[in-house]
A protein has these predicted regions:
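Hydrophobic alpha-helical elements and their junctions with loops/disorder across both membrane
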Residues: 14, 34-37, 186-189
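Flexible, solvent-exposed loop/hinge segments and secondary-structure transition points
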Residues: 41-173, 177-194
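Bacterial N-terminal signal peptides that target proteins for export
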Residues: 13-28
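Bacterial N-terminal signal peptides
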Residues: 26-36
Length: 194
């Protein structure tokens, strides 16, 4: 009787060949869930694009317009961003003020930013949606206020130096590039009748 009890006890401790597979499957599921949770947390909506447009026009936004992006303009945009814009770019215009909602890749994911341009100078910059896992400091006024009054020089560069943020270098470059694009698009929009 003792021998059979000992045999059953030792045999129950044996690991079946299915158990390592179950463990690996459960571990893989846990990792996938964690990645999804982290990815969901990385999408930070700081301000809805429609709210930004409304604020830019004191709650009375005009109808959205479309700017046909000419091949020469798109070539300049591609030099700045590394990719071209769609053939029609949505924007809002009232008098000399234009509003642009633009996206660029920071490190791995798109950053959505809004720019208000008036008389060929940026009057407001806001980070609307930030999807990166790092570098979200670019959303704060201490960074975005650097763009107030920025214009384009003849060579297409901003007329001022934009201070970087440690750990957010690629996001800083993306936001600066989008500022240049917003000014280029504003220039093209002002060249056509309202």
């Amino acid at each position: 009787l003792m021998v059979s009890t000992w045999a059953s006890a030792t045999s129950s401790k044996r690991i079946s060949p299915c158990r390592p597979r179950q463990f690996l499957l459960r571990a893989a599921c846990a990792v996938c869930c964690l990645v999804n949770v982290l990815a969901a947390q990385a999408d930070e909506v700081y301000l809805e694009p429609t709210a930004f447009v409304s604020q830019a026009f004191d709650g009375q936004p005009p109808q959205a317009g479309k700017l046909w992006v000419a091949p020469e303009l798109n070539a300049r945009v591609k030099d700045i961003l590394g990719n071209a814009l769609p053939l029609r770019q949505k924007y809002w215009r009232q008098g000399e003020r234009t509003v642009w909602i633009l996206e660029a890749i920071g490190r791995d994911k798109p950053i959505t930013a809004g720019y208000v341009v008036e008389q060929a100078a940026i009057t407001r910059t806001a980070i609307l949606i930030y999807r990166e896992s790092r570098g979200a400091e670019v959303r704060h006024p201490f960074f975005t206020d650097q763009f107030k009054g920025a214009t384009l020089k003849r060579d297409g560069a901003l007329d001022r130096h934009i201070d970087g943020i440690t750990g957010a270098t690629l996001s800083v470059h993306a936001i600066s590039a989008l500022a240049r694009v917003a000014l280029l698009l504003d220039e093209a929009a002002r060249a056509k009748p309202p």
